[in-house]
Amino acid sequence: EATVMYIHWGNEYETVENQRQRDIAQKLCDLGFDVIVGGHAHVVQPMALLESTVDPDHKTVCIYSMGNAVSNQRTGVSDQFPPGYTEDGALFTVTFEKYSDGKVYVSGTDVVPTWVNMHSNKGAREYNILPLTKDTEQQWQASYELTDQQFKSCQKSYDRTMGIVGEGLEACQTYLAQAKEAREEYYYNLAYNPELLETEATEAPAAEETT
């Protein structure tokens, strides 16, 4: 099985996680959680690949905050906090794979930035949550029927979110891709070349016993 924790934490309107979030996340990683999904800050916060301090083979994918899905907070809640970020959200996806021995692994993750387009439609206030993928950027304006200003707001929103999660997302994706490649080689050998695994096990150094 795989374990996912969805947690309500962090300081509102801060685009960087606080130390308490980091401490809790590390503890959850050490306990064996595979994925941590955070919320509450009303802004997007970074992603991170956490390494267990008790199991050298275990790592945890963490996004500290997915921001706002639907928001009436436009340019900022006060002069203390940066404008625009409360309009942003993140569609966070995780892919799991189950193997023949019943074990489940996290095999991939991704983030699609979203922007809340609050506008007037026939005198009524309307909210549209717009998913923003870079490869379709040139279609945003036509697909979502945006004004030039709204299109620019979409671009700014995308840049804000990827500026926050991009580094951590890349680290997670790189590790998961490498782990999957190694894992599939292992399972292939398990199915078709079991003698190779037996040889490796025989040649592996014995564990040191302590009393």
Please provide the spans of the model-predicted regions.
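A structural motif corresponding to the C-terminal end of an alpha-helix
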Residues: 1, 31-33, 97-101
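Short acidic, glycine-rich surface-loop motifs adjacent to enzyme active sites
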Residues: 1-16
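Active-site beta-loop-alpha junctions enriched in small/polar residues
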Residues: 8-12, 42, 67-69, 114
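Conserved beta-sheet core of the metallophosphoesterase superfamily
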Residues: 19-92
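A short C-terminal boundary segment appended to hydrolase-like catalytic domains
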Residues: 75-209
